[in-house]
């Protein structure tokens, strides 16, 4: 892995963060449009992705802020900041929780790309922690051994060598102040104890039921009697918790 002067996860964090806010998020009233917000209708849901016609809640903080697509992940990052960790430590902690609660978006078996700005140096660093393709992935392997004309769209033979953990390790080693023991603790605990399915994640599970049923292990973790769990039900992933505990203990 190499950093290039010039992290992309689903997170943006900084220890000293300022955002210019509009005084009127719906636009400035004009003669043609005296009430620009009149047609904005509140939408239900967790707003994990944002909703048409409605912005997310504003957060103003003096000492640090954490923004993710999941409240548990944001809480994990905030705890790290409150405990004395820096923005990179918090980003890794939040990312690890997302690897548990948001596996339709991210996971420790995936890749990691990051942008890190160091204010003291006035430098922007980019990290590409994409995994390598397995050495056995040859045209002959797919055609002769698997009977395929191309790389499949799912399954073990569709995934490259995981790069996420190496990326987390590189970030912590280069820019962090903590290690896996501290930054992975909340994620491991959530995988062990379970997490509730909000509206967005429940909808994702319902839409993925058929694909999840096609894989016995995925069905065991994410489905109940071949169906998505009811809204707000608790999911647990003990095997993932074991993997996270091993990384805490042994590192990359």
Report residues per predicted region.
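Bacterial N-terminal signal peptides
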Residues: 5-16
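Noncatalytic scaffold domains of N-terminal-nucleophile
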Residues: 21-75, 79, 87-252
């Amino acid at each position: 892995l190499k950093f290039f002067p010039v992290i992309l996860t689903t997170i943006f964090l900084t220890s000293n963060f300022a955002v210019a806010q509009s005084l009127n998020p719906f636009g400035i009233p004009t003669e043609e449009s005296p009430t620009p917000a009149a047609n904005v209708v509140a939408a239900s849901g967790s707003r994990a992705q944002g909703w048409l016609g409605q912005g997310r809640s504003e957060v103003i903080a003096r000492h640090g802020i954490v923004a993710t697509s999941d409240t548990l992940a944001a809480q994990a990052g905030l705890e790290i900041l409150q405990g004395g960790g820096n923005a990179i430590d918090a980003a890794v902690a939040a990312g690890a929780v997302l690897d548990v609660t948001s596996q339709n978006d991210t996971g420790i078996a995936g890749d990691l790309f990051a942008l890190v700005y160091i204010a003291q140096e006035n430098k922007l660093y980019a990290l590409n922690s994409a995994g390598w393709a397995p050495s056995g992935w040859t045209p002959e392997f797919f055609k002769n051994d698997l009977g395929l004309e191309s790389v499949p769209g799912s399954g073990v033979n569709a995934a490259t060598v995981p790069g996420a953990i190496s990326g987390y390790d590189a970030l912590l080693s280069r820019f962090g102040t903590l290690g896996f023991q501290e930054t992975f603790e909340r994620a491991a605990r959530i995988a062990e104890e379970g997490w509730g399915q909000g509206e967005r994640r429940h909808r994702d599970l319902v839409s993925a039921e058929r694909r999840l049923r096609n894989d016995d292990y995925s069905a065991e973790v994410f489905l109940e009697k071949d169906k998505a769990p009811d809204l707000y039900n608790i999911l647990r992933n003990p095997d993932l918790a074991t993997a996270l505990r091993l990384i805490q203990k042994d590192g990359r």
